[in-house]
Design a protein with these regions (language model features):
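Asparagine-centered strand-capping/turn motif at beta-strand->loop junctions
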Residues: 73-77, 216-217, 385-389
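Extracytoplasmic beta-sandwich strand-turn segments characteristic of Greek-key/jelly-roll folds
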Residues: 56, 61-63, 87-119, 199-201, ...
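A long-range scaffold signal marking pre-active-site subdomains of enzyme folds
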Residues: 22-88
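N-terminal export signals
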Residues: 5-23
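Short, hydrophobic/aromatic beta-strand segments
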Residues: 81-86, 222-228, 394-397
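Extended terminal and domain-junction accessory segments
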Residues: 17, 22-33, 135-167, 243-382, ...
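Hydrophobic or amphipathic alpha-helical targeting/insertion segments
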Residues: 117-146
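Histidine- and aromatic-rich segments of cupredoxin/plastocyanin-like copper-binding domains
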Residues: 94-95, 103-107, 176-320, 408-416
């Protein structure tokens, strides 16, 4: 059964409730364990996933800006795990990178995470131990940090986009983790696309209702190309960080793995029809989320939204920036003949036999060893990322946000994950305001597992 057939089998899905929300309690836990969920239509049976508290995606964690997030993570899996709080400017020891900022949480053990959420916005949490497998099996969820004052919207909807590689004969997740093709090409791409764990998610709305849509790409490697239909929208934040002015959605927009986009949309579709967040895939389009218009809103159309309140930031000083170069090499059709690994030069054949296909600056990446850069606290650094591979890469920096620089070298979007197209060179700039050893890696998670990672040390 191909993806089209699998999607068609679910086309009659009914409207479903929102993902579960966990209001922050005094001593809450987060338990990683196997679970069975109805991921596919019922005729296919249930799918075994690895999940937090038995659901995938995991419960939404929601706090106010400046509040603490406390979770005791209990590992009831048969393998080690950890939890990374993606996009949070966090204390290094709470970052959740197994083998770098903490030991992995062994089976039967637990670990207490306790940190402040300094920035309002849309974030997420996910496993950071063999993440190319554990995230794909379902170990992730939304982390929402609310602004001090409510935003002028009628509803706030969190939409976790994902894809799953499913064997339709068994309804189980394909166990082909670490497959050579995934490691060396575009990554592990699923054949079943969901929102909040459901295909063809539908929600009831009123015409002229104003919604805040928080889109999170939790997939291993899929780049979502999206559009709006029957909705008038404005992008108000990237990766949790507000834009200085809302940007009207004129055409399509892209959401790479690990990225988030906050939209404010007005429902313009007629009563009895539906507005859609549309996924464009090659020459086809699908409804990612449908907003079924059941009646008129009690409110009239409003003017364009105001910008969200900004999060605190020290702007990069580009006149005194330290320049760091990062050249990405390797992969299928990349032409790389070899790279340094473990302190010695290895041929491409030897690299492939060890499951490594990619290199940064001629070295197979790792969390230990020499960092890509050592930067003083408060120093501005400008990272020049050159993609000499045949594939795009979503590059994520832990512990801090950065500005993408435009072609004129001016500060652009403030993000934690940037998409670098094949053959593209992109510059980003950040203020190293958070001390620690911070991972920099491709969030096509199979790529990170096969060489695409480095470290930036802030001292």
């Amino acid at each position: 059964m191909n993806r089209r057939t699998l999607l068609q089998a679910t086309a009659a899905s009914l409207a479903l409730p929102p993902i579960a929300v966990w209001a922050d309690a005094k001593n809450p836990t987060l338990t990683a364990a196997t679970s069975e969920i109805q991921l596919l239509p019922e005729k296919y049976g249930k799918t075994q996933v690895w999940a937090f508290d038995g659901i995938a995606p995991g419960r939404e964690i929601r706090v106010k800006q400046g509040q603490s997030v406390r979770r005791r993570v209990i590992n009831n899996l048969s393998v080690p795990t950890s939890v990374h709080w993606h996009g949070i400017r966090i204390d290094n020891r709470m970052d959740g990178v197994a083998g770098l900022t903490q030991p992995a949480i062994e089976p039967g053990d637990q670990f207490d995470y306790d940190f402040v959420a300094p920035d309002a916005g849309t974030y997420w949490y996910h496993s950071h131990s063999r993440s190319f497998e554990q995230v794909a099996r379902g170990l992730h969820g939304a982390l929402i940090v609310d602004e001090a004052e409510p935003v002028d919207v009628d509803r706030d909807e969190v939409l976790v986009l994902d894809d799953w590689l499913i064997d339709p004969d068994t309804a189980q997740i394909a166990a082909s983790f670490g497959a050579m093709h995934d490691l060396s090409h575009a990554g592990r791409l699923g054949n079943y696309v969901t929102t909040n764990g459901k295909y063809n998610l539908a929600k009831s709305v009123g015409r002229n209702e104003r919604l805040r849509l928080r889109l999170i790409n939790a997939s291993n490697a899929r780049i979502f190309q999206l559009a709006l239909d029957g909705l008038e929208g404005w992008i108000v934040a990237f990766d949790g960080m507000p834009l200085s002015q809302p940007s009207p959605v004129q055409d399509t927009f892209v959401l790479a793995p690990a990225q988030r986009i906050d939209l404010i949309v007005d429902v313009t579709a007629d009563v009895g029809s539906a507005g859609h967040v549309v996924q464009l895939d090659r020459n086809e389009s699908f409804s990612q989320v449908a907003f079924e218009v059941m009646g008129e809103s009690t409110r009239a159309r409003r003017p364009a939204p105001l910008p969200l309140p900004p999060n605190l930031e020290t702007k990069p000083d580009l006149s005194n920036a330290r320049d760091v170069m990062l050249t990405m090499e390797g992969g299928a059709m990349g032409g790389m003949r070899g790279a340094m690994m473990g302190g010695q030069m290895s041929s491409m054949r030897d690299l492939m036999q060890s499951g490594n296909f990619w290199a940064f600056n001629g070295k197979v990446g790792s969390m230990d060893g020499e960092p890509l850069a050592i930067v003083s606290r408060g120093e501005t650094f400008r990272l020049n990322i050159r993609n000499d591979t045949a594939f795009p890469h979503a590059m994520h920096l832990h512990g801090m946000h950065f500005h993408e620089l435009d072609q004129n070298g001016h500060l652009g979007a403030f993000r934690d994950t940037t998409l670098v197209a094949r053959g593209e060179t992109k510059e980003i700039a950040a203020v190293a305001d958070n001390p620690g050893k911070w991972l920099l890696h491709c969030h096509m998670l199979s790529h990170a597992a096969s060489g695409m990672m480095a470290r930036i040390d802030v001292i």
